[in-house]
Amino acid sequence: MMLSKVVMGLLTASLAAAHMEMSWPYPLRSRFDPQVPEEDIDYSMTSPLNSDGSNFPCKGYQTNTPWRATAQYTAGQTYNMTITGSATHGGGSCQLSLSYDNGKTFKVIQSMEGGCPLVSKYNFKIPGDVANGQALFAWTWYNLIGNRELYMNCADVVISGGTGTPSSFESAYPDLFVANVGNGCSTVEGRETVFANPGDQVIYGGTVTPSSPAFPICH
């Protein structure tokens, strides 16, 4: 017999609190999204991506989940995203990025270097020169303490008011930093991840300052 959403939520409460997850904008298959059918909810959204990279990006959900925008953004405006959970693993570093090709390419619009996610809400600005239309909005996190992992949640969003195209946006913004998914790049426990190309919008926390050297350096 199928468990109700409430009962399943109670049974998985400890798992949901084990790590962190983006709760707004609603990620693909999120338990926070009231429009996701019960049978499609991922109650392990807080789990990291597979260490072999087999479900990078977005746990693969962008390829098998019907597209439905959970947020609408206007270029040049400021919005917020929310992270939920209790085990912050000492913080770490996060990035916010956009993809216009269904997850093949992610470009960074904001980095939070150090101390992320020690607060639950972050403001971010949608740049004025982004492209319009459907996009994937992604939150990625490299924890400071614990196993070397990559956490990633993605949301379908729609953007208007931008002056760019997908190609011009991809040319103007840095690539998403990717590590700990079998790609030959790994972070180091206890050492802050400092992105080599964080973009123009950067929030500093923990022990990271604007003069902190990039680490790790991966090619």
Swiss-Prot record:
InterPro entries: Cellulose/chitin-bd_N. Keywords: Carbohydrate metabolism, Chitin degradation, Copper, Disulfide bond, Glycoprotein, Metal-binding, Monooxygenase, Oxidoreductase, Polysaccharide degradation, Signal. Residues 1-18 form the signal peptide. Coiled coil: none annotated. Binds 1 copper ion per subunit. Disulfide bonds join 58-154, 94-116, 185-218. Cu(+) binds at residues 19, 89. GO terms for biological process: chitin catabolic process; polysaccharide catabolic process. Its EC number is 1.14.99.-. Lytic polysaccharide monooxygenase (LPMO) that depolymerizes chitin via the oxidation of scissile beta-(1-4)-glycosidic bonds, yielding C1 or C4 oxidation products. Catalysis by LPMOs requires the reduction of the active-site copper from Cu(II) to Cu(I) by a reducing agent and H(2)O(2) or O(2) as a cosubstrate. Has considerable affinity for alpha-chitin and, more so, beta-chitin. Active toward both alpha-chitin and beta-chitin allomorphs and enhances chitin degradation by an endoacting chitinase, in particular for alpha-chitin, and so plays a role in fungal chitin turnover. Belongs to the polysaccharide monooxygenase AA11 family. This is AA11 family lytic polysaccharide monooxygenase A. It comes from Aspergillus fumigatus (strain CBS 144.89 / FGSC A1163 / CEA10) (Neosartorya fumigata).
